[in-house]
Amino acid sequence: MQTNLSQLIKVARGETEADLVLLNARVINVFNAEIEQTNVAVFDGKIAGVGDYRHGKEVIDLKGAYLLPGLINGHTHVESSMLDIAQYARAVVSNGTLALITDLHEISNVCGKEGIDYVLDASADLPLSIFLQVPSCVPATHLETAGAEINSQDVADLLRLPNVTGLGEMMNFPGVLFGVPSVLDKIIAATGKVMDGHAPGLSGKDLNAYISAGIHSDHECIHLAEAKEKLARGMYIMIREGSSEKNLAELLPLVTDKTYKRCLFVVDDRSCADLKSDGDIDAVVRKAIRLGLDPVRAIQLASINTAEYFHLQGHGAIAPGYLANMIVCQNLEQLDIDMVFHKGKLVAEKGQALFKPQSRIPKSLLNSIHIKPFNTEDLVLKTIQPQIPVIEVIPGQIVTRRLDLKITAENGVIKANTELDLLKIVVLERHHQSGNIGHGLIRGFGLKKGAIASSVAHDSHNVVAVGTNDADLYTAIKELERINGGIALAVDGQVTASVSLPVAGLLSTKPLEEVVTELEEINNQVAKLGCKLSAPFATLSFMALPVIPELRLTDLGLVDVKTFKLIPQET
């Protein structure tokens, strides 16, 4: 250790040759927002110096290309990619993401700590630094049934692991406001650590109360005024641009000379198709530049700002002593990535990963679909109420609206009405064979025929399905049982497409390219049936999340998120 440090110092002083020297680089300096024409010397995976260095075991002349720090994704759920962690690394490293922060609460809600162990073990040899925010909401709420639990003692134990930065997004904001002991115990266990927030629409005294608990950030802002208030009260604002959650254009005016240090870019949830076609956090940087943000500032929000918020020593900058995580590109505005270096090693070039990751998937994670036997009669929506609460989808957002509509029942049974775009939605508990089934109506999917189903359903990941009739709903759900989890489409009683996600019912075991092809095929088929949503299965996956306003459906029934209570249904 001391020998390496001594050698690093000698390289920095120019007394010993470097492992790698990058000549004629235009280095993005994230500390002073300047671009320096200079050279960079690397030794033992770290940057030894920036300046007049020319002698190295390997010398690459960048000929005036830009050299950026490796990008950092400040808040993402890797499970939303539907990829095994090895394939996920292939997708994001080639796009310049060399570090990320995740809380793994998706796989944890299915498998508990075993799911966390799988991701951390599988990522150990990857050229990608994964930092864990311990999941705070497993289960997310008392309004749904999860597959596992992580209590305050588990939180305390996990916080002692390497690469653990703090406590993950506290989605149960009502639990904070109402002082629920189990929620407060987790916050107390994480005292002194970074604590991420999740507080959609919270303002005024409730916002003050939430922040007073020690919660430092929020990524759920969808309106500029909301983001301004939260920033003014001391929060870091994570500006989100994911596959379903697109808030960048609305929130970008928040970033000014006075406020930019309190802002960072995140994706939250991004599909493998988007990762392959558009990129990861690099896509957010590119879009921010297109929307008018200075390129260097955009890079700061995806590197040094994130590193400083999470106290990631050695990440986020090209400077002496920092990890040699670097990106080479020719055009700063387009961020067309030519080369990616991880700890001084070339790991991706021209969008292609140069490493061959090995998957390490425990067999115990491959059997997670446990639905109590059911039939089509169990999917029937019955009511005697004159008005029915209906979930309305908002395209491009994960928030929903509550509609209270007069629906005519036939002998007490409510059916879908495709002319009015009123479809059936059901949620089936899939962890403990409890037999719980939630029933409701939803508007915004636009299907004219068939049904879609998914075992990806934030955050407890029960089975959620939307369709035009009970027979197709049944067929699509049964397909999920057959393939051990995933997504499925059924039309006229037949399965027409499905994608198997057998790892916890969330992740594929196949290569990135195959998963993307399968997803494109099923999405195309769904579009032909009338669905106008750009990401129908991503949207579907959020319809059972009872911590995002306004109306949701879980296996226990309809949830009014404003009151944080189940809505009684009279049958």
Curated annotation (Swiss-Prot):
EC number: 3.5.4.2
Enzyme category, top tier: hydrolase
Keyword Manganese: yes
Enzymatic reactions: adenine + H2O + H(+) = hypoxanthine + NH4(+)
Cofactor needs: Mn(2+)
Pfam families from the UniProt entry: Adenine_deam_C, Amidohydro_1
Residues that span the membrane, as ranges: none
Keyword 4Fe-4S: no
GO molecular function: adenine deaminase activity
A biological-process GO annotation: adenine catabolic process
Domain of life: Bacteria
Keywords annotated in UniProt: Hydrolase, Manganese
Gene3D superfamilies: Metal-dependent hydrolases, Urease, subunit C, domain 1
InterPro entries noted in UniProt: Adenine_deam, Adenine_deam_C, Amidohydro-rel, Metal-dep_hydrolase_composite, Metal_Hydrolase
Family per record: Belongs to the metallo-dependent hydrolases superfamily. Adenine deaminase family.
Protein name as catalogued: Adenine deaminase
Gene source species: Dehalococcoides mccartyi (strain ATCC BAA-2100 / JCM 16839 / KCTC 5957 / BAV1)
